[in-house]
Amino acid sequence: MTKDMTTGAITPLLVKFTIPLVLGNLFQLTYNAADSIIVGKFVGEEALAAVGTSNPLMTLAILFINGMCLGAGILVSTAFGAGDHKLVERQVSTAAIAGTAFSVAFSLLCVLLATPLLRLLQVPADILPMAVRYLRIVFSGLIFTFFYNFLAAVMRALGDSKSALYFLMVSSVLNIGGDLFFVKVLSWGSEGCALSTVLSEAMCCLLCAIYIKYKVPILCLGRRWLVFDGKLLKKIVSYGWASAMQQATVQMGKIAVQGIVNTMGVSTMAAFAAASRIDDFAYTPQQNIAHAMTTLMAQNRGAGKKDRVKEGFRCGIRIELVYAAGLTVVCFFGAEGIMRMFAEEPEVIELGARFLRLISLMYFLPALTNGIQGFFRGIGDLKITLRSSMLSMAARVPSAALLVLYFHMEIEALPWSYAFGWFLMLAYEVPPMLRFLRNGTMENE
C-alpha cells in the first residue's frame, strides 16, 4: 500500500501520516523501557545500571544503521513523488544488497569492540562483565535491526506509515513477554533482556518482509527484483552517510555525557538510565514527526511543488510544539510517580525526578530543532543537519563536563548542557531555513 502525498489537504495528510509513526515509537520505547523496568524490579540496581550504561552504545549502532536507511528513504520518496517507479525499484534493491553486507560486518565489529568501548565510558568494574554480555547479545542481532529499519523506511517513503506500526505492536508484546520469561522465570538477568530484544526484532523484520512481498506491488521482492546499480549506490551512500553521521554524532554526544555520568556514582547512573528512558518518550516521537515532514517534503520536492514543501514545514512545527507541551505537563507533574516504575531505591527516584522536572521545561527546544532538521532532510540538504548536530554536541559535552567537574553540580547539570547545545543548533539552522521560506530555493537550484 502506497500513498501519494503530493495532492490533498496538507494538514490532515501530515497528521494521519504522523500518528502511526508516533504510536510506533511509543511502542518501541515501551518495550525498550520494559528492559529497564523488569531488570530494575527483578534483578536490581547493578543490573539496571549495566543495561543503562550499555544503552548509549547500543543506540549509537542502531541510529547509525537507521540513518543509512533514512538517507536511502529520502531518495525513494523523491523518486516516488516524481512518479519514477523503475528508479524506486533500483534504489531499494541496491540499498538492500549493500545494507545487508554492511550490517553483517558492522555487527561483527561491534561485538569485538564491546569491552574496550565500555571501558572507554569508564563503566565501573563491578558491572562491566554484565554490561559486556548484554551489549554483545544485542549487537549480534544488528542484521535484524537493519532489515526492519530499512523496510520500514521504504514503506514510509512510499507514504505508508501504518503497516510498520502493526508489526511493531506485535514485536513489543513479544519483547515484554520475553523479558518476563527470560528474566523472571529463567533468571537470566540482563542477558535475558538482550535476547528478548533480538528475538522480537527478528519477528518484526520477518512480518515486514512478508507484508511488502504480497501487499506492495511496486516492490515485488524476489530474484528478478534484485538489481545492484553501482552508480546509484554512490548517491545512496552519500545521502545515507550524511544521515547516519548526523544520527551518530548526536548519540556520540550522549555517550560522552554518559561517561561523565559514570563518574557520579551508581545511584546517579541508575537514575540517569531510568530518566533517559522516560526522556526518550519526548525526543523519539519528535524525531518521528520530523520523519513524516521529511517524507511529505521529499515527495513534493520530487514533484516540484515548493509551496506544499513550505506548508508541510509549518504544519509539522505546529505538531512538534503541541506534542512537546503535552509531554512537559506529564513529566513535570508526574516525575516521581514515573520514576517509581523504574526503581525502588529512594535516592534513585529522587535524582531521576529532579532530572525530569528540569528537562521537561526544555522540551520545546528539541521540538524546534527536530522539525527544522526534518525540513532540511526533505529538501535534500543533509549537510546542514550534520553540521548543526556536530555543533550541538560540541557544546553539550564540554558544558556538561564543566558543570559537573568544575562547578560540582549534580544531575541538573545535564539538562542545562542539553539546552546550551539546542540553542546553538537553532542559531545555526534558523537563518538558512528562513532564506528558503522567503525565496523557495532548493538544493542545487
Please give the residue ranges for each predicted region.
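Helix-terminus/linker motif at the lipid-water interface of multi-pass membrane proteins
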Residues: 26, 30-49, 118-125, 181-190, ...
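Residue-level hotspots within the lipid-embedded alpha helices of multi-pass solute transporters
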Residues: 25-29, 63, 103, 107, ...
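Short runs within selected transmembrane alpha-helices of multi-pass transporters and secretion channels
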Residues: 69, 137-156, 164-172, 193-208, ...
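Alpha-helical transmembrane segments and their lipid-water interface positions
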Residues: 28, 32-39, 62-69, 73, ...
